[in-house]
Amino acid sequence: KGWLERARIGMDERPDALMRGALATLHKHAPELKVASAINHPSSICDEIDDVSPVIMYANGFSPETLAKRRAAGHKTTYYVCCGPERPNTFTFSPPAEAEWLGIFAAAQGFDGFLRWAWCSWVEDPLQSTDFTSWPSGDCFLVYPGGRSSIRFERLRDGLEDFEKIRLIRGYAVRAKLIG
């Protein structure tokens, strides 16, 4: 069924020293397994990670050349936001346009997409409060129980649709140059 090609061992937001040990263990005992990681600091181990997502504050460390090299090697590179930065983000107090901007930024920077850590990690009563501990309101979820959407999700989806349109147009433009 192709599960091995789709599976990833996730190692998120860990110091490089811990990542190096884990990667060495994986390479030794299960070299066929691929690794995904969200990284929240500049890191020298990105070349060893099949599916890497830097936090937006470090996204500029991935030049167009680096992204092309990773893509040619079969690696995926997205970026993410989490409980930081305050802007742009998808918090309940964020201007809705910020959520849409996230997909457009991914396209503009040449990333393969955008990583969102939580879709529906609901708090006790998400219809009454979107707060979870000290995290910004709404960080844990984009949709509500019972099939309820949110303006944050709808605008993020719009931005991801824009991302996909841009990706398709770029592909058509490349093919047109080759043909024509």
Q: Across the structure, where does each feature detected by a protein language model lie?
A:
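Aromatic- and carboxylate-lined catalytic core of secreted/periplasmic carbohydrate-active enzymes
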Residues: 87, 105-180
